[in-house]
A protein has these predicted regions:
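C-terminal alpha-helical cap/extension of soluble enzyme domains
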Residues: 21-32, 50, 54-56, 216-219, ...
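Glycine- and other small-residue-rich loops at beta-strand/loop junctions that grip anionic moieties
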Residues: 97-98, 124, 128, 153-160, ...
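Conserved functional loop/turn residues at catalytic and ligand-binding sites
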Residues: 7, 55, 116, 146-149, ...
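Catalytic alpha/beta core domains of metabolic enzymes, predominantly
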Residues: 144, 158-260
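Single conserved hydrophobic/aromatic residue that forms the stacking wall/gate
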Residues: 1-15, 303-311
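Short linear Ser/Thr-Pro motifs
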Residues: 3-5, 64, 68, 99, ...
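A general structural signal for well-ordered alpha-helical segments in protein cores
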Residues: 44, 76, 80, 105, ...
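Active-site beta->alpha loop and helix N-cap motifs at the rims of alpha/beta catalytic domains
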Residues: 19-27, 35-160
Length: 311
C-alpha cells in the first residue's frame, strides 16, 4: 500500500529532523574584527581551526557573541557564507538569523539556507515584546518559509519575552523545529519543557554555568560562550556526562564555573573578546555601541583564566 509507505516515510523524515543537530558543546563564536571594523577573516579562519582541533562540536556563527546586532545585513550574510565554506563540513554550522522583524528573519534565514548552513538559530523577537501567540506565529512563518532545522533561542534577559513551556511544546509540533537554546536561567522551566516535549524538542543550555544542571534535566549540551576560550573543557563537561561519568562532568563544571561567570562581568561579548585576545588570538575591537571593559572589570574577569585554557 503506497499510502502506508508514504506515511512511514513521513514518520522517518520527522524522526531525522528531530535528531539533535549536535550533542556536546557548540561555540557561540566571536567575530574577529580588523581595526577599521571590518571582519578579519584571516584571524577567523585560525580561530575556527583552533575550535575544531580542540573538540568543539558545532559552530554558531552570527549569534549574540558574534556581534550580529551590529553587522549590516550584507555583512551578516557574507559572514555565514564564508563560515560554511571554510568549515567545509568538519562540524555543523548553525547560523544566527533571528530578528524582531519576521520578514527580516525570513530574508536572512533564506540566505543562510542558500549558503549551506546546517541549521538556523532564531532568537525571540526583541524589543517589541510580542505575546505567546505572536511567538508561535513568528516562528511558524519562518519555519514555513525555509527548509532547515530550527533552534529556538530563549533569552528573556536580553529580549524582554520568554518562551513559555506550553509555547515551546506547541512549536515542537512543527516538523523542523529541532530544539531550543534555553537561557532563561529558570531550571524549573527547562524541566517542564522536557516533560512536555520529550524527544520532540532537543534542549541546549544557553548559560555556561548551568551546563550540568540542564544536562540533568534532559539537555543535549550547550551553545557556549566559554567554548571560545576553553573548547576542550566545555566539550568534556558534556561528553563525560553523556558517557555516564557524571562525577567527572560535575568536577569539570565546578572547576570552570567561575571562569564561565567571569565572561559576564560586562555585557557579552565584551569580556570574552578580551579573553580571546589573552589566549593568543587577535579578536580585534568591538563595534559601537559596545565598548571595552574598564580596567577593574578586566582584572575581575581575566583572573580566572588558568594555564589549561592558554593557546
Amino acid at each position: 500500500d503506497r499510502s502506508v509507505s508514504r506515511g512511514l516515510g513521513d514518520v522517518y523524515k520527522r524522526q531525522i529532523m528531530k535528531n539533535p543537530i549536535f550533542t556536546g558543546a557548540a561555540v557561540a563564536i566571536i567575530t574577529p574584527m580588523n581595526e577599521d571594523g571590518t571582519v578579519n577573516y584571516d584571524e577567523f579562519a585560525k580561530f575556527i581551526d583552533f575550535q575544531i582541533e580542540n573538540g568543539t562540536d558545532a559552530i554558531v556563527v552570527c549569534g549574540t557573541t558574534g556581534e550580529s546586532s551590529t553587522l549590516k545585513v550584507v555583512e551578516h550574510n557574507e559572514c555565514i557564507r564564508w563560515c560554511v565554506e571554510y568549515v567545509n563540513h568538519r562540524v555543523p554550522v548553525i547560523a544566527g538569523t533571528g530578528s524582531n522583524s519576521t520578514a527580516c528573519a525570513i530574508e536572512i534565514s533564506r540566505e543562510a539556507c542558500k549558503n549551506g548552513a546546517d541549521a538556523l538559530l532564531l532568537v525571540t523577537p526583541y524589543y517589541n515584546k510580542t505575546s505567546q501567540r505572536g511567538l508561535i506565529a513568528h516562528y511558524t512563518a519562518i519555519h514555513d518559509a525555509t527548509d532547515l532545522p530550527i533552534i529556538l533561542y530563549n533569552v528573556p534577559s536580553r529580549t524582554g519575552v520568554n518562551i513559555k513551556p506550553e509555547t515551546a511544546a506547541e512549536l515542537a509540533k512543527l516538523p523542523r523545529v529541532n530544539g531550543i537554546k534555553e537561557a532563561s536561567g529558570d531550571l524549573d522551566q527547562v524541566a517542564k519543557i522536557h516533560e512536555l516535549c520529550g524527544d520532540e524538542l532537543n534542549i541546549w543550555s544557553g548559560n555556561d554555568d548551568q551546563i550540568y544542571d540542564i544536562l540533568e534535566r534532559g539537555g543535549k549540551g550547550v551553545i557556549s560562550v566559554l567554548s571560545n576560550i576553553a573548547p576542550k573543557e566545555t566539550h568534556d563537561i558534556v561528553a563525560k556526562y553523556l558517557d555516564g561519568d557524571k562525577p567527572a562532568s560535575k568536577e569539570l563544571m565546578d572547576k570552570y564555573e567561575k571562569l564561565a561567570k567571569a565572561m559576564f562581568v560586562d555585557v557579552n561579548p565584551i569580556p570574552v573578546k578580551e579573553a580571546v585576545s589573552l589566549i593568543g588570538f587577535n579578536a580585534g575591537p568591538l563595534r559601537l555601541p559596545l565598548v571595552e571593559m574598564d580596567e577593574a572589570n578586566k582584572k575581575l574577569s581575566l583572573i580566572h583564566i588558568s594555564e589549561p585554557t592558554r593557546h
